[in-house]
């Protein structure tokens, strides 16, 4: 895996991935923690579920255009445009914080996710280009580990700063009051987006525009592209089954994230957002460890034997989770869920990228997000 860091452009690529995930997660943490402080019970769970839905919806609606763009244009160019969009959106988010516009900031979660819907196929499609076919699994392991570290960092940094700011302003009792205090966090989002933009221009370009066919909006709205793209991702059984496996995993992960704060509050009697985020972070630590292990075990090949091991680990831990009543035990279970998840997803992602033709990889990766 070390040899990848000697490849020109790989370090800027990894650093850019870190900042992208850090920014996307940071805004979500601010909104989620505000919801957690103001609302409780069913309302709290419903609003957190809506936040997660806003993050997922663009990946469904933008499946066809995101795949088309990732196929047509060099991936670094797509990531550069996405980085420009991130700067613009984080500026709007910071303005909403300053004005105390909670619901506008809430809605901008959808816009930020829309940017990610275009960014994601380019990001994963670039792994094969920069790491090479022989190191595709190792590249996936590093990318997943980096993204996970960024998520963990975002959880801790934004939750810590959120709690620290509120501790000195105990009179903030409404979403608007809380957001007005979060201007420094908005500035942090903007600053990271600017650095991400600079790094995006350090990525080497390996391909040229390879698809001159225009994107027809009418066919998009009539579902012509959708039917054709679904047929594309189902052409190869290995790719389709890998996508189904990843969709199942991420569906479980989203459900777990949505209900865990309420579970921690009512079952574990834990009301501190930092502590709750720390337990969720244990899952992230596990994913990071599992991804690195999977990447190391898959040097110069894809170790598919890790897939059933990961699946059994996830199922066992999720079955045990409702029976525990202690914070430490819960954290350990979440850690094992994460390790199992890393072992599960790295071979599946690698299989998709390895099996598909280069000219269709953008569509397949966007389809993976869509499913």
Question: Which residue stretches match the model-derived regions?
Answer:
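C-terminal ends and interior cores of transmembrane alpha-helices
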Residues: 84-100, 312-326
């Amino acid at each position: 895996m070390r040899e990848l860091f000697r490849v020109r452009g790989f370090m800027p690529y990894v650093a850019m991935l870190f900042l992208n995930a850090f920014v996307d997660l940071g805004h979500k943490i601010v909104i989620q923690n505000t919801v957690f402080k103001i609302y409780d019970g069913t309302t709290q769970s419903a609003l957190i579920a809506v936040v997660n839905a806003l993050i997922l919806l663009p990946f469904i609606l933008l499946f066809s255009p995101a795949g088309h763009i990732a196929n047509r244009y060099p991936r670094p160019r797509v990531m550069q445009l996405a980085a420009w969009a991130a700067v613009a959106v984080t500026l709007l988010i910071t303005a909403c914080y300053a004005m105390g516009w909670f619901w506008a900031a809430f809605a901008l979660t959808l816009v930020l996710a829309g940017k990610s819907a275009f960014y994601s196929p380019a990001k994963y499609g670039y792994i094969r280009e920069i790491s090479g076919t022989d190191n595709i699994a190792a590249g996936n392991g590093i990318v997943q580990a980096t993204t996970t570290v960024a998520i963990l960092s975002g959880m801790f940094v934004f939750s810590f700063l959120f709690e620290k700011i509120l501790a000195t302003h105990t009179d903030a009792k409404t979403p608007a009051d809380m957001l007005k205090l979060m201007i420094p966090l908005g500035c942090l989002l903007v600053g990271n987006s600017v650095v991400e933009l600079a790094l995006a221009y350090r990525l080497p370009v390996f391909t040229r525009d390879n698809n001159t066919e225009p994107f027809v909006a009418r066919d998009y709205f009539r579902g012509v592209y959708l039917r054709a793209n679904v047929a594309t991702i189902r052409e190869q059984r290995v790719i389709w089954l890998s996508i189904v496996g990843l969709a199942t995993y991420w569906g479980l992960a989203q459900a777990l994230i949505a209900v865990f704060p309420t579970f921690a509050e009512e079952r574990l009697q834990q009301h501190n957002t930092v502590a709750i985020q720390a337990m969720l972070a244990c899952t992230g630590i596990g994913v990071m460890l599992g991804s690195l292990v999977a990447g190391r075990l898959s040097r110069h090949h894809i170790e598919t034997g890790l897939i059933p091991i990961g699946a059994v680990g996830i199922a066992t831990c999720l079955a045990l989770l409702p029976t525990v009543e202690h914070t430490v035990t819960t954290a350990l279970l979440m850690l094992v869920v994460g390790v199992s998840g890393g072992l599960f997803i790295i071979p599946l992602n690698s299989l998709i990228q390895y099996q598909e033709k280069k000219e269709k990889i953008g569509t397949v990766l966007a389809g993976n997000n869509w499913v």
